[in-house]
Amino acid sequence: MKSVKKSFQYGNHTVTLETGGVARQADGAVLVNMSDTVVLVTAVGRKEADPGKGFFPLTVNYQERTYAAGKIPGGFFKREGRPSEKETLTCRLIDRPIRPLFPEGFYNEVQVVATVLSMNPEVDADIPALIGASAALSISGIPFDGPIGAARVGYKDGEYLLNPTFEETAASDLDLVVAGTENAVLMVESEANQLPEEAMLGAVLYGHEQMQVAIQAINELTAEAGKPRWDWHPPQGDAALETAIKDLVGDDLAAAYQIPEKQERQNRIGELRQRAVEALGENREEEGGWPEKDVGDAFKGLEKDIVRGRILAGERRIDGRDTRTVRPIDIEVGSLPRTHGSAIFTRGETQAVVVTTLGTGRDAQIIDAIEGERKEQFMLHYNFPPYCVGETGFMGTPKRREIGHGKLAKRGIEAVMPAADDCPYVIRVVSEITESNGSSSMATVCGTSLSLMDAGVPVKAPVAGIAMGLIKEDEQFAVLSDILGDEDHLGDMDFKVAGTESGVTALQMDIKIQGITREIMEQALEQAREGRLHILGEMNNAISGPRSEMSEYAPRLLTIRIDPDKIRDVIGKGGATIRALTEETGTTIDISDDGKVTIASADKAAADEARRRIELLTADVEVGTVYEGKVSKLMDFGAFVNILPGRDGLVHISQISNERVERVGDYLKEGDTVRVKVLEVDRQGRIRLSMKAVQDGE
């Protein structure tokens, strides 16, 4: 098969899609080159589904090879290990927009693998990987209702930027990734610097408009190199089974979905599901019956119809709320006595226990990313143990979902974090989800904001988050504020917004259907703003701003700046000076190459003493200034006096007294404390001192 290429201009980048030359045994394989960042994306699907499988087994793997950046991996084995956080997040980024485009009832296993082969350190590989996944699936013949396009959007000085570089993104007020088909937006992932809702919506629509060139190129590639679409037909619904289930449990199921308490409701629904299986399944006493999987699918369909129908008819939601009401909120701040900052945030049946820990510069996380090494001063970790939903399960390393939710919460908070000069601490926040019924990532945002303020971190403003949902049938739709887990599962959109009173700091959107209009997104953003302001009001009642005093158990950090040329004076020969300083004062001292000195200690007095000593070590000797010093050595011609740490000057025999001095030892001995005045510092740094000048001055 000959190689087929399609190229297009995408912002300031040229993108080339190529197929037919590499990985030819995969169902679909595309090399994407975006300004020298090259990603190979393959798609393979099994021709037969596993019998009895009731879900779509899609796997997405994204892997960055260090050779792409001309590096050799660290560690003993010198090869890539488990996925990094960036790789895990990119897997989710690819999965979310492509998953809804596989047809209902398609349960064949599909695997998409994206491998970064070459890396331009200024061009992120996530957009080429997304475009490549869309292209590989489109040419593979696997049933897929794509293609999709993807774009990164920045925002600076009132202008949108298309596919900005890493450097441009760092200077931008927005980092937004949007993916969608020709007619619809399917996924948004973003962080922003408190931007208004109109700017966020404008960025989504701008990105969708600009990605059409990528969709067109994929369509052209598919027309020229695509394989025939699989001869797959969706399973037909069984009208008789649907009617039988509705007659059997319809009224009881509708009543069950009006039980506000989650576990009681789930227990009742479980009983009804079991009743349906026993009455209509193949194992019933009478002849006939349907397979258990079919009965389960029909039961799920009835659940969906009941919940969605009630909401679209203007009736109350599952827990009795209307579409705009936020669940009751309960907040406890500072409840964990030995932590540096803590908050328990409860919204309905979702609860997060969030704890802040303050550390020093040496606690920063070193990220050895493919585009370069950096230090992370702010970490946010999200834990979702099985007990929070009343289940048992394996507990170990964080799963993809936990990493993704933690990153979303971090994006929501990052815009209000103080600059390093205002808060020199390394900060780690951990969110323990102790109860969950929808929107736990947004509970983490609220809890993190409260916990940081309890720890005394000078955040620029409090941040709250809310999850929105959507039910849409034809032209009728309802936007739901603060959705429950069931509403998320049975709805058409999951739309999470975090922000301050001034604007949005993070937006994540996952849309399961086509046809979400600008009007729907506008209403969702406006309703989210209304809910966010309500939550901020509740948070303000608990703690209105950062505490002025930190926990007594938090380290005290003092930051001073010294002349970089004097760093060696503080460190001393072989590190002797700084080692003695830390041991004698009980502090931890970090010195950066630019002369920034950070002193950490649980005892403020010890930190102050360390600062005083460092200031003395780095002080300049000023001519005309009187110092108190110790006689360090006697000579025939005078005495050396230590006036500053590491700085000795000479008091000549003629400068000891107004009287004639025959022997230095008659007036001074080693260890004496004397007051001296600096007469001169010569070009070689030698210091001339006088005791006589001090006497004359007095």
Curated annotation (Swiss-Prot):
GO terms classed as biological process: mRNA catabolic process; RNA processing
Gene giving rise to this polypeptide: pnp
Primary subcellular site in the record, as a coarse category: cytoplasm
The name this protein goes by in its record: Polyribonucleotide nucleotidyltransferase
Family according to the record: Belongs to the polyribonucleotide nucleotidyltransferase family.
GO cellular component: cytosol
Function comment: Involved in mRNA degradation. Catalyzes the phosphorolysis of single-stranded polyribonucleotides processively in the 3'- to 5'-direction.
Cofactor: Mg(2+)
Catalytic activity entry: RNA(n+1) + phosphate = RNA(n) + a ribonucleoside 5'-diphosphate
The organism's taxonomic lineage, starting at the top: Bacteria, Pseudomonadati, Pseudomonadota, Gammaproteobacteria, Chromatiales
Compartment annotation: Cytoplasm
Quaternary context: Component of the RNA degradosome, which is a multiprotein complex involved in RNA processing and mRNA degradation.
Key word Transferase present: yes
Domain KH: residue ranges: 555-614
SUPFAM superfamilies, per the entry: Eukaryotic type KH-domain (KH-domain type I), Nucleic acid-binding proteins, Polynucleotide phosphorylase/guanosine pentaphosphate synthase (PNPase/GPSI), domain 3, Ribonuclease PH domain 2-like, Ribosomal protein S5 domain 2-like
Magnesium keyword on record: yes
Residues involved in Mg(2+) binding: 488, 494
Cross-referenced PANTHER family: POLYRIBONUCLEOTIDE NUCLEOTIDYLTRANSFERASE, POLYRIBONUCLEOTIDE NUCLEOTIDYLTRANSFERASE 1, MITOCHONDRIAL
Molecular functions per Gene Ontology: 3'-5'-RNA exonuclease activity; magnesium ion binding; polyribonucleotide nucleotidyltransferase activity; RNA binding
Domain of life of the native organism: Bacteria
Domain S1 motif, chain residue ranges per copy: 624-692
Main enzyme class: transferase
Organism: Alkalilimnicola ehrlichii (strain ATCC BAA-1101 / DSM 17681 / MLHE-1)
